[in-house]
Curated annotation (Swiss-Prot):
This is UPF0342 protein SE_1526. It comes from Staphylococcus epidermidis (strain ATCC 12228 / FDA PCI 1200). Belongs to the UPF0342 family. It comes from the Bacteria.
């Protein structure tokens, strides 16, 4: 009997959607979207992050004033309870992804371990 890995991947997707970690992110993000100030801060910070990533990928230097702006945004975000809750939930989900990834790559790790 052939194993269809995609079926298992789809089951994993559903399990992730049913997880407490996913639900916490979904609920926290809803709070961010409902609060105008939180949403604005969140959107600005995401835009700044994407701009940084794009510049890094293109090998461009990030100007000092952009770094300062990002630092100010990060400080404002830390003070926002809604965004802090979202970031904490994202960290927990990230930990789940790391653990799942370790499980997924275990067969390959075992091959190369010898």
């Amino acid at each position: 009997m052939a194993v269809n890995l995609y079926d298992y991947a789809n089951q994993l997707e559903q399990a992730l959607r049913d997880s407490d970690e996913y639900k916490a992110i979904k609920d926290a993000f809803a709070k961010v979207k409902e609060n105008e100030e939180s949403k604005k801060l969140f959107d600005e910070f995401r835009e700044t992050q994407m701009n940084f990533q794009q510049k890094q990928m293109q090998g461009e230097e990030i100007p000092e004033e952009d770094l300062q702006k990002a630092q100010e945004q990060a400080q404002a975000i830390e003070k926002d309870e809604n965004i802090s809750e979202l970031m904490n939930a994202e960290q927990k989900m990230s930990q789940v992804f790391q653990e799942i990834n370790q499980i997924i790559v275990k067969p390959l790790d075992e091959i190369y371990a010898d």
